[in-house]
Amino acid sequence: MLIDTALEAHYAERDENVRLTSTVKGQFELARMQHLLGQYLPDPPAVVGDIGGGPGTHARWLRDRGYSVELLDPIPHHVAQARAAGIDACVGDARKLPWEDEYFDAVLMAGPLYHLTCLEDRLTALQEATRVTRPGGFVAVVALNRTANLIGALLANELQQRQPVVQEILDTGFSPANDRMAETTYHTVSQLRQEMSGHGLRSITVHGLTGPGGWLTVALDAHFHHQQPPATLTDPDPLQTALTCSRIADRFPELLPASSQFFAVGQRA
């Protein structure tokens, strides 16, 4: 089985194709991803693997910048959407990639690491991503912060209802009762560094993908997604405020745990 049935149902209920464009939080996350990818990708033309690339949001951006992109995702509907957008895409498993050794100049793995709840599976996926990357190329992964549910529930004023789930995720990194995203594991910074190490990757660097600025966008979407926010939350543009905040925070490693998502990068030895 490529994907857990609960996770498949989760994505069947949501249009992943518009997730990063239909909300302030999504637009913010997309802008941050593009900013961080730009720091590590080789100049185009180059061949980039998008592992767990969903319907191809990142792949389309990479293609439009001049990269050759090949996408893999376990959900056939996502692969069909990516193909419809002109992306070379296939159904597959991050733990058993179909490409030969040293095939890509760089690899992005934005989904599999947090949807593989077994440590052995995550390590296998990292080994596979490293295997298909050429020496000197970067492997970039996205992970979710264990504290994200605590702060997110606080800002949405839902902590009292969600406290058991939040506490379990803080304690173990996983909760089978997590109703927000099925079959999802959450990392600490040190845990993510440890999992990234030992696969032929060097110079492991962890960034705050969303940084502290992301929490402004979470609050906006939680309370004003279907209505107009007050003027104090629209002028100046809150998206630009959030981006400015997180770019400032990038210079301070001690602020890394304030990010709801992590962007970790290692270079193939």
Regions found by a protein language model. Give the residues of each.
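Conserved class I S-adenosyl-L-methionine
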Residues: 1-44, 57, 81, 138-169
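Class I SAM-dependent methyltransferase SAM/SAH-binding core
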Residues: 49, 55-96
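A short acidic, Gly/Pro-enriched loop at the edge of an enzyme's catalytic core
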Residues: 95-107
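A short SAM/SAH-binding and catalytic strip from SAM-dependent methyltransferases
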Residues: 106-120
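A short glycine-rich, Lys/Arg-flanked "PGG" loop and its adjoining helix->strand segment in the class I
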Residues: 123-138
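Short alpha-helix
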Residues: 183-200, 206
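C-terminal helical/coil "lid" or tail adjacent to the Rossmann-like core of SAM-dependent
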Residues: 204-253
